[in-house]
Curated annotation (Swiss-Prot):
Gene Ontology cellular-component terms listed: cytosol
GO molecular function: 3'-5' exonuclease activity; magnesium ion binding; nucleic acid binding; RNA exonuclease activity, producing 5'-phosphomonoesters
Species of the source: Pseudomonas savastanoi pv. phaseolicola (strain 1448A / Race 6)
KW Transcription (keyword) present: no
Name of this protein: Ribonuclease T
Chain positions of site Important for substrate binding and specificity: 42, 90, 137, 159
Length: 225
């Protein structure tokens, strides 16, 4: 199914059409929302979702975008979830840490989706599009969680995304998040990496920097459809 065909079938889903709003005009009715997940492995169907963060994107009166609001949750593994020891070693997540204070997948996803729907309404957008660094990985885990819980109101487009690894490769010649941030002049602390919150906020800075740089270069103007 093409993106346009999906949009036609879901025209009214997700909040107020309003292409007059500058954010809706900039991204064809989509609201970029940056997402990062930390997981128990690479398989979204079998491996645990352990952390998830999302950053909604705002736009100022000049048409420049900025990271607006962060949502972050440590997540309890779903029943029967696989967790690879190598994944925990890589992320540094300690499941038994007394301050981990994890919530269920349902709580995490519902709270994030509620915030995203609020941002959709505020920006006159009909649907969110996931922004991620290697976005297909994050989108796969979001979609798997939605399917596990049989959630009916997923504000994210099910297959379209903006990948900052690709965008940063184009803009800066770097595809690794830390190196792309360095090339973009964004501070990046490797000791904080592989926290969903930290990586999401840095990815949001990177995405906004690329979009704004393109605007400054005259690469986008607000044309009516």
């Amino acid at each position: 199914m093409s993106e346009d065909h999906f949009d036609d079938e879901h025209e009214g889903h997700g909040g107020g059409g309003g292409s007059r709003h500058p954010m809706a005009a900039r991204f064809r009715g989509y609201l970029p929302v940056v997402v990062d997940v930390e997981t128990g492995g690479f398989n979204s169907a079998t491996d645990a979702l352990l952390e998830i963060a999302a950053v909604t994107i705002g736009m100022d009166e000049r048409g420049f975008v900025f990271p607006e609001h962060t949502y972050f949750f440590r997540v309890e593994p779903f029943e029967g979830a696989n967790i690879e020891a190598a994944a925990l070693e890589f992320t540094g997540i300690k499941l038994d840490h007394p301050l981990r204070m994890a919530v269920s997948e349902e709580t995490a996803m519902n709270d994030i989706f509620r915030g995203v729907r609020k941002a959709l309404k505020a920006n006159g957008c009909k649907r969110a599009v996931l922004v991620g660094h290697n976005a297909s990985f994050d989108l796969g885990f979001v979609n798997a969680a939605v399917a596990r819980m049989d959630m009916k109101r997923n504000p994210f487009h099910p297959f379209s995304s903006f990948d900052t690894a690709t965008l940063a490769g184009l803009a800066y010649g770097q595809t690794v998040l830390a190196k792309a941030c360095q090339a973009a002049g964004i501070d990046f602390d490797g000791r904080e990496a592989h926290s969903a919150r930290y990586d999401t906020e840095k990815t949001a800075e990177l995405f906004c920097g690329i979009v704004n740089r393109w605007k400054e270069m005259g690469g986008w103007e607000d044309f009516d459809d």
